Amino acid sequence: MEKKLFNGARHLLPVSERQSLEKGLVKMKAKREGKIPALVTAWPKFNDAFCDGLEWRTITVVGARPGTGKTLFMEQVVSDIIEKNPDQKFRVLKFQMEMVDETSAIRKFGLITGADYNTLMSKDGKLVDKKLFEKCVEYYKSTINNDLINVIYDTCTVSEMCATIHYELERYKNEDGTYPNMLVTIDHSALFKNDIGQKDKFEMLGALGEALTYMKKNYPVAFVVLSQLNRNIDDTKRQVEANYGNYVLDSDIYGSDALLQHADVVIGINKPSIRKIKKYGP
C-alpha cells in the first residue's frame, strides 16, 4: 500500500508576489481617484484608526466593560455609517444574539430619540410622551426607503454565521452578478454556540477568528465584533487613579489569543466614572 505524503493534504497554489504588487498599485490608484472610499463615522479617532474611516475587508474587535454601552456604540456606528456615506452602496447584517428583537428595536428608538429605555417603556406609570412616541413611528416609516439592515437574533455556530453571510450576499447580488459590500456586526463574540468538535468557548473563538479572516479574504465584507472583557479588568489595583492599569489592554479581551491575531484594529471602550476614577491613565 502506497504511503500518502503529508497525510494526503492538497497542495496550495502560490501566487506570484509580482501579481500582489500589481494589485497593490491598482488599489493605491483607485484610492487616489476616490473609487474605494472608506466608511466615515462621527468619531475622528475611530476614522483615524483606519485610513479615513472603516475599510472594507477588515476585522475590528471592540472590547468593552459591562455598563459602558457597547451595544449602543455598535448601533451608533451603524447609524453613522449609513447617514454619512449616502453615496456608497452596501448592506448591513447584524448578529444580535443577546437580545430579543423588540428589545433591540426599543434600544434603537432610544438612540434615535435620545430617550432611555425606561422612558420609552413608560416605567413607574410615567407614560411615554406622545410626541416622543410619534418620533419613533416616523423613524419606522422612514426605513421603508432605506431598508439596508437585516438582523439574526438566533444563536448560531460560526459555520452557520458564514453560511448566512454567503446566503445574504447571494440574495442581494448586484445586477452584474457581483456581490455587494456588506458590513457585518457581531454582538457579541462569546455568544456563538460551540460547533461539532469544539470543546469550549476558546476553541470556538479560535474558529471564529479563522472564519472572519477567510470571509474577509473571499468576500467584500467588513466585520465589527464586540467582545466581553476578562474579570482581571476589575482588579482593585487597576482602579487606582492615574495608573496604566486604568486602560483597556489587549490581554483584557476575552479569548484574546484566539481572536486578536486576526484583528486589523482593536478598540477598547471604558467608562471610568463607573469605578469613580477621576484621573484616567498616567
Residue ranges and their predicted role:
Residues 41, 48-49, 84-180:
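Cytosolic-facing regulatory segments adjacent to core modules
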Residues 98-102, 155-159, 189-191, 228-233, ...:
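Conserved nucleotide-binding/hydrolysis micro-motifs of P-loop NTPases
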Residues 107, 208-282:
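Phosphate-binding/switch region of NTP-binding enzymes
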Residues 120-125, 194-204, 238-249:
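Flexible beta-alpha connector loops of hexameric P-loop NTPases
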